[in-house]
Amino acid sequence: MNKKVIFIDVDGTLTTPDGKVPSSARHAIRAARENGHIVYLCTGRSRPEIISSILEIGFDGIIGAGGGYIEVNNELVYHQTMPEDAVRQIIAYFHRYQIGYYLESNDGLFGSENCKDVIRKRITEGLPEGSEAFENADLEFHWFYQLLDSYQHKAIDYGNVNKISFISSKAHPFQEISNTFDKEFTMYRTTVAQFGSESGEIAVKGVDKYKAVEFVLDYLQISKEQSMAYGDGDNDIKMFEAVHYGIAMENATEDLKKVAKEITSKAENDGLMRSFKRHQLL
């Protein structure tokens, strides 16, 4: 058997728009591993955001925080954090302009006081206030709100922050924020589509999915020719460049589709299962 290493993004790839993992995807991953293939999560989410309903599927390892955190068989093998003084400067900047943000670390997820309100405001923009659509617009983020709440009273270790996500608006656009911090950090725009086009992430320079995938392949001593990846966002372009065969979801960005070798169906239409069957992984 030609053993494969398969890297799978989470949001919009493994999960449906409401954050659920289809039973077909669960079955496909478990069956592929039973057949001897190696399956890794490769996500922008930090460790606390990878919730139990995802972990219980069973994976051989995790690339988290967009490449800043790597776990192999439940063992931490790589972790890159932002400088503490820079984290504090960024927070002060966001407070000054009332920009919602959350710090992503292995210890927890720490949101600004206005974080949930700003997220809801972005998600409900353009919807008639009081309508059913308005009231239910952010239902898929309730798990995320609960996660933020669960760390609300925990002390923050500012030296253990993987990356910072922010939710801004046209009043203080992404490009303005990027111009302020892009000399020291890598800036990613709109990594969560529902947060709006002015939202983004601030990450350590040199940390991305390309280098993380490369690290894992080297660690496992497996060639690039045996690797595959599934994704849907622009931050998956680096992941596709690092593997032999990149497969984009139907809902993927146009830029990702341009570098993909194949397009599969959306998660809710059994995209992973269909592709796994096509590549005889089951």
Predicted regions and their residues:
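Mg2+-dependent phosphoryl-transfer enzymes with acidic/Ser/Thr/Gly-rich catalytic loops
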Residues: 1-5, 21-22, 199-282
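Active-site phosphate-binding/coordination module
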Residues: 17-129
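Hydrophobic packing residues within well-ordered alpha-helices of enzyme cores
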Residues: 25, 50-54, 177, 256, ...
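A generic structural signal for well-ordered alpha-helical segments
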Residues: 32, 94, 178-181, 256
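Short, structured coil segments at secondary-structure junctions
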Residues: 57-58, 66, 181-183, 242-243, ...
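Short hydrophobic/aromatic-enriched beta-strand-loop microsegments
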Residues: 59-67, 186-190, 246-251, 264-266
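Conserved acidic, metal-coordinating active-site core of Asp-based
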Residues: 108-228
